[in-house]
Amino acid sequence: MNVKLVSYTRDGEKVVAIASKMSRSRKGWDYHEKTMTDEEIEVWIRDAILHGYWSVLEHSIYTFSIEGISRVASHQLVRHRVASYTQMSHRFAKPIDEYYKPITPPSIEKRAKEIIEKAYQEAYENYFKLLQDGVPEEDARYVLPNGVNTNIVVTMNARELYNFFALRLCSRAQWEIRAIAWKMLEEVKKVHPRLFRYVGPNCIIHENFIRNEPITLDEVLQKDNIEFISQRCIEGVMRDGILKCIRNSKHVLEYLK
């Protein structure tokens, strides 16, 4: 799996901060662009996110190239509908030779690797038999497994990314889409750390709505003295188990090593 941020709004943090401030100011864009300091950028981003004023996040756009994932994962991705997608077509880009690398889930890798490898190989052979019999590519691909590898270009704004991360960083998310989410988060934090400082699974998002001082995902991952106020997360995990649950979620990246 390879996840790469290929394009983004360069001044996204400042754009979001100015938009947030302009909603409460009589002055226009030019004034705020000239006068806004780095400290103000952080203040206005924090204010918007922690008060649920997420519409301003929509002004910053991010495009990712996500390669070497299964069709199972890509079908989950496109359920996030406030986004744009362009996926590799198995009609025009036939999955042959080195381009046929179906994804094997870790649970099967440990228990039934031979079974899935045999099924993948049989599907591959049947695909070619259909092509040789004159079946069109768009119909022959019906025998390909859900695990067949694919590439996809994904564009989301920062608000949709917050919603995406809230769902897909959660340990209850399926392992592959969860790994994609963690890798996407790594990419956006490289370029806009202030904008994505308060991102996290839903347990962190909802926790910060009721705290006087917000917590960050980095703090939860690195510090053992973090205590949650919420009695339980929206997935039903009790307060004492939330910290461990979040940390377990990121362990999915170890499958990819």
Swiss-Prot record:
Positions of the catalytic residues: 168 (involved in ionization of n3 of dump, leading to its activation)
Cofactor(s) recorded in Swiss-Prot or TrEMBL: FAD
GO biological process: dTMP biosynthetic process; dTTP biosynthetic process; methylation
List of residues binding FAD: 55, 79-81, 87, 157-159, 163
PROSITE patterns registered for this protein in UniProt: THYX (PS51331)
Record's cofactor remark: Binds 4 FAD per tetramer. Each FAD binding site is formed by three monomers.
InterPro entries associated with the record: Thymidylate_synthase_ThyX, Thymidylate_synthase_ThyX_sf
One of the record's GO molecular function terms: flavin adenine dinucleotide binding
Pfam families: Thy1
Enzymatic reactions: dUMP + (6R)-5,10-methylene-5,6,7,8-tetrahydrofolate + NADPH + H(+) = dTMP + (6S)-5,6,7,8-tetrahydrofolate + NADP(+)
Keywords assigned: FAD, Flavoprotein, Methyltransferase, NADP, Nucleotide biosynthesis, Transferase
Domain ThyX: 1-202
Motif (ThyX motif) on chain: 79-89
Family: Belongs to the thymidylate synthase ThyX family.
Role, per record: Catalyzes the reductive methylation of 2'-deoxyuridine-5'-monophosphate (dUMP) to 2'-deoxythymidine-5'-monophosphate (dTMP) while utilizing 5,10-methylenetetrahydrofolate (mTHF) as the methyl donor, and NADPH and FADH(2) as the reductant.
Protein name per UniProt: Flavin-dependent thymidylate synthase
Originating species: Sulfurisphaera tokodaii (strain DSM 16993 / JCM 10545 / NBRC 100140 / 7)
